[in-house]
Amino acid sequence: MRIVSVNAWGGAMFGELAPWVESCGADVLCLQEVTRTPGLRGWTRFDDAERSLPQRADLLADVGSRLPRHQPLFAVSDSGPVLDQERGSHRQDFGVATFVAETLPVVGVRSAFVHGGYVEHHDGWPAGDRPRAALAVRVYDRPARRFVTVVNLHGLRDASGKADSPARHAQAERLAALVTGAREDGDLTVVCGDLNLLPDSETFRILAGLGLRDLVGDADTRTSRYRRPVRHASYLLVSDPAAVKEFEVVAAPEVSDHRALTIAV
């Protein structure tokens, strides 16, 4: 069973992302920064006080069309205005998505906000302190005859950096509560995503209390598209390291400003 996680950057590098999605071999694909604009396809432009980025209007549908034998699950954290190529304004949903191969029965789904709560931004997207949702899916791995719970998370972005803060401590506690509620005794548990943390964050101590061990450590999880010096962002934690057959922080191909994380169990 292969689990793959990457911050998709709203599909900004869709020319590279699309063929990779089809070929990466994910049984469970966890994406962060996923977009959906009802009634619109193609390209939009996202703007906040710090950035202006091209994004796919409906990355959820774009990826789904390339994984027709996967079940899509989408948890929206917030929504706001984007512009189409004719400068028309549309409301775009933003969140995390998990695509599960049809060979894996989905036996449980749960989502929760780990920071804030759902917001509709009417006067533009804020640069920071946006709400964050996490999405947990519990599947049955038939060949291994076991249940696997996979939690997909996009952590709080703070303009001041990735250091621990009271908000990140609260986020870790909420995440731990979601993991506890979503899994059952004996489940292999995987938590993955763009956590926006430093490797020494107390979040890892809190999750270690649930038996979760980080596999990434201080590895570089950013690509050449990211120009800032701090190269830590994405992580993958597992409850049973002995079950891991393969783990990789994928340096190539580059499909985002984040490197993908892939694990075989």
Annotate each predicted stretch with a short phrase:
Residues 104, 177-189, 196-265:
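Metal-dependent phosphoester-hydrolase catalytic domains
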Residues 122, 131, 142-169:
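Metal-dependent phosphoester/phosphodiester hydrolase catalytic core
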Residues 5-10, 126, 164-169, 193:
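Short, flexible loop segments at the rims of nucleotide/cofactor-binding pockets, characterized by
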Residues 35-147, 249-252:
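Structured beta-strand-rich core segments of catalytic domains in phosphoester-bond hydrolases
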Residues 11-13, 36-39, 80-82, 157-161, ...:
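Active-site environment of divalent metal-dependent phosphoester hydrolases
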Residues 52-57, 165-174:
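Charged helix-capping and loop-helix junction motifs
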Residues 3-7, 20-51, 99, 137, ...:
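Active-site beta-strand/loop signature of hydrolases that rely on acidic residues for catalysis
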Residues 11-21:
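Short, acidic/polar
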